[in-house]
Amino acid sequence: MLSNRKKIILKSIIENYSKEAKPVSSKLLTYTLHLNVSSATIRADMAELEKQGYLLKKNYNSSGRIPSFKGYNYYLNNLIKRNEEFIEMFSFVDKIIQKKSFTKEQLIKKVLELLSEFTSYTAIAIGSDILKTSKINKIDLIYLNYFELIILIVTDKGHVQHQNIVLNQKKDVNMLDIKKVIIILNDLLKGKFLFEATLIIQSDIVKKTIGKYINCEEQFIESFVEIFANFVDNNCYLSGVLNILNQPEFNNIEIIKKLINCLTKKELIKIMTIKKRLTFKFSDNIELIQLENFTIISIPYSINKYEKGQIAILGPYRMNYHKVIPLLEYLSVYLSNLYDLNN
């Protein structure tokens, strides 16, 4: 249990470190907090906070302290206050979005653009798990020539994916065989969720059946699996990726490369599993990304009953949480209303 004075000191260290990205000294806290105690008393409290794990061990090149993972966790759960001045910007956000009509995709992209601009961090959006919410409505194979086809898949939600495939087989593919394969695939997969279709098409019985008409069935089936993966990839958006370059924590070129490589759509989906509330993920708890000092804050949004997902901010540990959190909360709650206003 932290005393009120220690809470004030911890809160001040975190918020000062967020602004300056430099260790916070007891001297600075003495001048700014007006606690009517000596600098020595504040130093003793800081030493105690360090022992309790809320601050990182003192760096002897500096007289100050920086928050630890535990310190940030405590701050986010107990000490943070929403920035009232920043909340006043919400009406400005409304005016920008209500100026013109957006499709759902355009609206989400605009929201991310505003998030990244207002926070100077990287904004992320991931739609609902399309593999579990969309069913196959139609499969078509468009015959281009003896070896080349276009695979076309349409879902019940109107999502469309297509892919060219050049078949590596010795004999030509004829149109009659293609028509038979189309009938077989539609019989098997129409009305199935995308994740079910992914499993079905890789089954031995389907491979054997398709192999009667197309010699290179393995290549053919792999192309279908790639299309199903594309449905997921096209359900993820990023804005402000280069904002990472402005953060002193990420000024090492190797760190930047690693972080940007991790910002691939498939990796993000693994990190950002859908939750029903505001969620904080610190790099210490993300095994997928072997980097330090960054945080992902995510919150669910809902455009309608079926189209749900998450919006998130990725930034350094010391991000301005009191600004970021109210903006995320606001956009999450009102994303559905904003879409209604634009239609």
Curated annotation (Swiss-Prot):
UniProt KW Membrane keyword: no
A GO term, aspect molecular function: DNA-binding transcription factor activity
Keywords: Repressor, Stress response, Transcription, Transcription regulation
Gene Ontology biological-process entries: negative regulation of DNA-templated transcription
Matching InterPro entries: DeoR_HTH, GAF-like_dom_sf, HrcA, HrcA_C, WH-like_DNA-bd_sf, WH_DNA-bd_sf, WHTH_transcript_rep_HrcA_IDD
Superkingdom in the source lineage: Bacteria
Gene3D superfamilies assigned: 3.30.450.40, Heat-inducible transcription repressor hrca homolog, domain 3, Winged helix-like DNA-binding domain superfamily/Winged helix DNA-binding domain
One Pfam assignment: HrcA
Keyword check for Nucleotidyltransferase: no
NCBIfam families: hrcA
Family: Belongs to the HrcA family.
Function statement: Negative regulator of class I heat shock genes (grpE-dnaK-dnaJ and groELS operons). Prevents heat-shock induction of these operons.
The protein's name in its UniProt record: Heat-inducible transcription repressor HrcA
Species this protein is from: Phytoplasma mali (strain AT)
Lineage: Bacteria, Bacillati, Mycoplasmatota, Mollicutes, Acholeplasmatales
